[in-house]
Amino acid sequence: MEKPSGQFLGLSLLLLPLLLPISCNAQQLFIFGDSLYDNGNKPFLATDVPSTFWPYGLSIDFPNGRWSDGRIVPDFIAEFLGIPFPPPVLDRSANFSSGVTFATADATILGTPPQTLTLGDQVKAFAQIKSTWTDAQRQKGIYMFYIGANDYLNYTNANLNATAQQQEAFVSQVIAKLKDQLLAIYGLGGRKFAFQNLAPLGCLPIVKQDFKTGNFCLPLASNLAAQHNQLLSETLENLSETLDGFNYIIYDYFNSSLRRMARPNNYGYFTTNLACCGTGSHDAFGCGFKNVHSNLCSYQRGYMFFDGRHNAEKTNEAVAHLIFSADPSVVFPMNLRELFVHP
């Protein structure tokens, strides 16, 4: 039997006091993923986290651990459902009756990076506190995911000349591990899974800046994301056909992002090529860093990206609306509102 890591033992101690009383009528939202969905777990695991410093949070007056100028996608989804924002799982003072956020900046599906909760750690944390909710609540709750970007960005940095076969093998490895974690959540009662698929990662301002591609996207990173998204779709469809009660949706974030990048003015953006906060050729590095003098745009709603890899609040709000109520050309096989009321 695999021995628990020291990091997870420490996490276990943090979670022991969190079995809180709940309302029998509560609606639950469980958030898994990385910094796109992290609303404050990272500061419990590391010091001087940029998202806890200005100008993060400037649209809501203060930094709060979110990697944006304001609210992130799960915040808006919670608002649409009429429930409180799902608090960070590592906040021992929080009330988890309406759900919880396991997502943590730097999280991956594979590997064991330091000072984060991998997807495996997040699922273990859910297993540890699952009795916080009744069986019925866990079955009716929504399990939201944005995960995998760090796996492919790390792979790109280390394997810039990877062959097609090597790329395919790595994507298969990532999806196989992700499937294992979904099966674990299903075994813990999860039935309704909502995925925001991966962005065209090669088009992130930080990637363009790091790899000096100018206004062009880095093909390898975006190709890996596209392969991941295709295999994810096939895997979820297979699980829905083989597991009783397994339901899912996928928001096509990849193509939705490309549409915004192709016609920024149609979406009210000045630019989708540069970040609002940061330094460098694309203003993509250093936002919130103590010892970096970053540029800050004067109107963050004119930017798709707040920093080099995270969306501005305006973009997050638009994404949340699409996840919640768009038609099947954007979110399929149903939208989140339909999934929530699905038997």
Swiss-Prot record:
Glycosylation sites: 95, 154, 161, 238, 255
Noted pH dependence of activity: Optimum pH is 8-9.
Active-site residues annotated for this sequence: 35 (nucleophile), 307, 310
Database matches in Pfam families: Lipase_GDSL (PF00657)
Subcellular location: Secreted
Domain of life, per lineage: Eukaryota
Family membership noted in the UniProt record: Belongs to the 'GDSL' lipolytic enzyme family.
Function text: Has lipolytic activity towards triacylglycerols, vinyl esters and phospholipid. Of the triacylglycerols, the highest activity is towards tributyrin.
Protein name according to UniProt: GDSL esterase/lipase
Protein source organism: Carica papaya
